[in-house]
């Protein structure tokens, strides 16, 4: 076993060696390096063929038409294109958008920007299991609502929204539905022939593909119109200009093709690893699982260790790569906005760690990590006066702290 151990697969995944090989074949002078938009010679034709093959591979994982896949630089850009593209195109129809308080910052910050432009956004409060229900959405739908944007799987707590039921609701009301599927692609089955979803964001680097490439599914039936946010040579049917990076696209396509073949077996293996880890740490007192106990992906285990400061715990686990909150916001010492929205108090939100398991995680690594977590939590609690008070039966929430 090699140290340090990587248990932060929800932040990013390493590129699968099979993917890296396919990408390398598109870089050098002997490889497929041409510009896919070059129509006048074989180098361009071969590159375009590789791009279209990648488009087909992405479409096959989610059962969509390849023509519904638009290449972007990642899920952040896909989210921006979906929200701004819909808002700007359909603003004469209405200016109301619905999302939730626990979305990724790529959706929340885009929604804030649209508010500055005069759109009205309703931010739903999920249940404490991290799930937004169809009833919650229905309660705030209005005649001028043009878009509902919700994630499929939450990046911090791994809970799964029932996007099938929410899609039925939005479609029946004539409201567009955007789903951020960055954390669900390759983990949860997605069938866009059945789901009533109009737009869906994807990222390659959460699925063992390269960083810097993603896609946006844009439905053709019913047809969804978008106003572009990046202008130029009119690539991607005018929705997203810019020379297509053949090697990145080939990488994303191969990563999604592997996910399609191996998802079922991989999910079972990762569930076994996650259960094995949880079983070993579950003897710790005052341990809380964040998010849904049932509707969740096995890859993500977000735990709060009461009376332990999360940052201290992270520092104590120096050979184990885990995170508190999402990678995009984990540099701040603020407690996770997601856990706060789920109703966790500051103390529990501050004591949370996200463990995420993946394709290259081994049983040996899981056992080592569980042992180190137990040792660190017990040691930090020994040093904590709050833990002593809790063990003595003092209700800490009732204490009036006096300022010196």
Curated annotation (Swiss-Prot):
One of its GO terms (cellular component) is L-cysteine desulfurase complex. GO terms for biological process: [2Fe-2S] cluster assembly. The modification N6-(pyridoxal phosphate)lysine is found at residue 206. It is an enzyme of class 2 (transferase). Signal peptide: none annotated. Its cofactor is pyridoxal 5'-phosphate. Pfam families: Aminotran_5. The keyword Iron-sulfur applies. GO terms for molecular function: 2 iron, 2 sulfur cluster binding; cysteine desulfurase activity; metal ion binding; pyridoxal phosphate binding. Keywords: 2Fe-2S, Cytoplasm, Iron, Iron-sulfur, Metal-binding, Pyridoxal phosphate, Transferase. The keyword DNA-binding does not apply. Pathway: Cofactor biosynthesis; iron-sulfur cluster biosynthesis. InterPro entries: Aminotrans_V_dom (IPR000192), Aminotrans_V_PyrdxlP_BS (IPR020578), Cys_deSase_IscS (IPR010240), Cysteine_dSase (IPR016454), PyrdxlP-dep_Trfase (IPR015424), PyrdxlP-dep_Trfase_major (IPR015421), PyrdxlP-dep_Trfase_small (IPR015422). Its main location: cytoplasm. The active site is at 328 (cysteine persulfide intermediate). [2Fe-2S] cluster binds at residue 328. Belongs to the class-V pyridoxal-phosphate-dependent aminotransferase family. NifS/IscS subfamily. Master enzyme that delivers sulfur to a number of partners involved in Fe-S cluster assembly, tRNA modification or cofactor biosynthesis. Catalyzes the removal of elemental sulfur atoms from cysteine to produce alanine. Functions as a sulfur delivery protein for Fe-S cluster synthesis onto IscU, an Fe-S scaffold assembly protein, as well as other S acceptor proteins. Homodimer. Forms a heterotetramer with IscU, interacts with other sulfur acceptors. This is Cysteine desulfurase IscS.
């Amino acid at each position: 076993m090699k140290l340090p151990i990587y248990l932060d697969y929800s932040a990013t995944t390493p590129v699968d060696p099979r993917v890296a090989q396919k990408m390398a074949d598109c870089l050098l002078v002997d490889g497929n390096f041409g510009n896919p938009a070059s129509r006048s010679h074989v180098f361009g034709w071969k590159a375009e063929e590789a791009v279209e093959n990648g488009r087909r591979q992405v479409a096959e994982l989610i059962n969509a038409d390849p023509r519904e896949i638009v290449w972007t630089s990642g899920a952040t850009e896909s989210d921006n294109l979906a929200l701004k593209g819909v808002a700007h195109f359909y603003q004469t129809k209405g200016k109301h958008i619905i999302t939730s308080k626990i979305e990724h910052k790529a959706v929340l910050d885009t929604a804030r920007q649209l508010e500055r432009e005069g759109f009205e956004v309703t931010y739903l409060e999920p249940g404490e299991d991290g799930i937004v229900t169809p009833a919650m959405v229905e309660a705030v739908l209005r005649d001028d609502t043009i878009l509902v944007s919700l994630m499929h799987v939450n990046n911090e707590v791994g809970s799964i929204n029932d996007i099938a039921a929410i899609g039925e609701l939005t479609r029946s009301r004539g409201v567009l539905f955007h789903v951020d599927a960055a954390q669900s692609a390759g983990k949860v089955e997605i069938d866009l022939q059945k789901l009533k979803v109009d737009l869906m964001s994807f990222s390659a680097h959460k699925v063992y593909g390269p960083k810097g490439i993603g896609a946006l599914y844009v439905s053709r039936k019913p047809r969804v119109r978008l106003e572009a946010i990046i202008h130029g040579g009119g690539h991607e049917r005018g929705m997203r200009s810019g020379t297509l990076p053949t090697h990145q696209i080939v990488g994303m396509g191969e990563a999604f093709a592997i996910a399609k073949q191996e998802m079922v077996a991989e999910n079972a293996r990762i569930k076994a690893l996650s259960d094995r880890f949880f079983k070993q740490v579950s003897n710790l007192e005052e341990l809380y699982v964040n998010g849904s106990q049932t509707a969740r992906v096995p890859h993500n285990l977000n735990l709060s260790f009461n009376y332990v400061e999360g940052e201290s715990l992270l520092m104590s686990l120096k050979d184990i790569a885990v995170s508190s909150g999402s990678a995009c916001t984990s540099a701040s010492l603020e407690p996770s906005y997601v856990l706060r929205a789920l109703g966790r108090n500051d103390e529990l939100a501050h004591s949370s760690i996200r463990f995420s398991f993946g394709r290259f995680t081994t049983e040996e690594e899981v056992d080592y990590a569980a042992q180190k977590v137990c040792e660190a939590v017990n040691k930090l609690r020994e040093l904590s006066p709050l833990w002593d008070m809790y063990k003595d039966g003092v209700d800490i929430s009732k204490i009036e702290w006096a300022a010196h």
